Amino acid sequence: MKRLAVSILCLALAGCAIEKAEVRTPSFDEQLPAPQPSYASGSIWQAASAGIAEDHKARRKGDIITVVIVENASASKQATTDTDRKASISASIPYLMGLEKQKLILGKLTGADLGNLLGASTDSTFGGSGATTRKENLVATMSAKIIDVLPNGNFLIEGRRNVKVNNEDQIIILQGTVRPRDVSPDNTVNSSLIADARITYTGEGVISDRQRPGWLMNFLDYIWPF
């Protein structure tokens, strides 16, 4: 009887217990390193010498290409415009029912000349000239990384070089498309062989700030009507 009472009491306490919620921990996919290729060692060809015959030219995403930047550009333009326009008009009525020699002034008819009934003339002249000359020269060497390989095999490259001298940053940014056959055996390519090339050369620092007008001058130039 005593055992039965203890069993009933335990069941009652178990029914009043709060069920503990199961805590689920997020599962993460384990990232395993890519397996390295294995080479079978032979009597002549050893696994350690497998890189001797390998082509070291950049051809995969992430490979690095050395770009030799040589950009020379010059342009000049001159324009001269001269225009001259003249126009004249005149009209007369030699005969008008005999009234060509009469004119009504203050109730009296006097002689009238209809030979110069209407006359007008205009003269417009315009002259303008302009000339512009621009020269650019950029020589540099930098490395760029293959960021993508297109379906036709061409490389999309992108590179950035930052040189800081006396708190002045000189920044070169390069983007473009390169054909694999244009990459030389020493893994270099000339900038003239890069399609859709975007080469930006800029600076940040005290000297660059002094080469630009202040914000107030820019504002006055914007609102000044003359």
Curated annotation (Swiss-Prot):
Spell out the GO cellular component terms annotated for this protein, sorted alphabetically and separated by semicolons. Answer: bacterial-type flagellum basal body, distal rod, L ring; cell outer membrane
Residue numbers with lipid attached (S-diacylglycerol cysteine): 16
Among its keywords, does the record have DNA repair?
Answer: no
**Entry superkingdom:** Bacteria
Cystine bridges: none
Please indicate if the UniProt record lists Cell cycle as a keyword: no
Q: Which GO terms describe its biological process?
A: bacterial-type flagellum-dependent cell motility
Q: Which UniProt keywords apply?
A: Bacterial flagellum, Cell outer membrane, Lipoprotein, Membrane, Palmitate, Signal
Instruction: Give the membrane topology.
Output: Lipid-anchor
Give one GO molecular function term. cytoskeletal motor activity
Major place of localization?
membrane
TM region(s), chain numbering: none
Residues making up the signal peptide according to the UniProt record: 1-15
**What does the similarity note say?**
Belongs to the FlgH family.
Q: Report the function annotation for this chain.
A: Assembles around the rod to form the L-ring and probably protects the motor/basal body from shearing forces during rotation.
The annotated subunit structure for this chain is: The basal body constitutes a major portion of the flagellar organelle and consists of four rings (L,P,S, and M) mounted on a central rod.
Protein name stated in the entry? Flagellar L-ring protein
Gene name per UniProt: flgH
